[in-house]
Amino acid sequence: DPFRPQMLGEGGLGLASAGAVIDAREAHFAAVREMFETCTVFIFTLGLTEAWLTEDGMALPVPPGVLGVTEGASAASFHNFGLSEIYQDLEEVLADICIVNPQLRVIFTVSPVALAATFEPRHVMISNTLSKATLRLAAEMMRERHARVCYFPSYEIVTAPVNAPGAFEADLRSVSPLGVAQVMALFNRHMLSGGEAAAAAPAAMPAPSLNATASPLSDEERAAYDARARIICEEDLLATGPGP
């Protein structure tokens, strides 16, 4: 995806030419088309509401300058998407996908990973709460309107006070391997069972000890997890800076 430059090129430094970007774009779009045409269930995770937009309306993966590229940075503008915008976008995306895949089912989730920074003139915790609440409500509106849509509470599983300590890393933002294991265990139990209740979240979430339900990770497993986690979201660059 050319809009995610750290995912492409040697050392994650982006592609070398405009022609290479065009080629990568065509391959990316072909893969996206194939995915939407052939998948039976699409899991759509909503992460944050703040964005930086180019003059023609394209959204950047990180704020201008974060990756060390200043060219064109002044042309990008900050935008914090509101509930009505997000809901309209989700409706349009779902309608477009269902044209090529009428039988598709969609599972919405909200990421429990907190914002690393905010451009709004307020504390990041306040922006994070508003962002997650807005996305959660948008997902609920989609669930209420469409029979093909359901919601899986990964956000609630990790952040609920009833959960045991250990769902977050030491930075209190990143979800720990124990937290991921808890989410996936509940997802497997309630969404992959094959029964009629598989599309619905449980009425009451259990509160098992994370430390009691997941085996300790070896150093090799932890290194592999950390390496994979680094490529998931460029928003992490706001907290850690660009990688090598």
Predicted regions and their residues:
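Extracellular glycan-modifying ectodomains
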Residues: 1-244
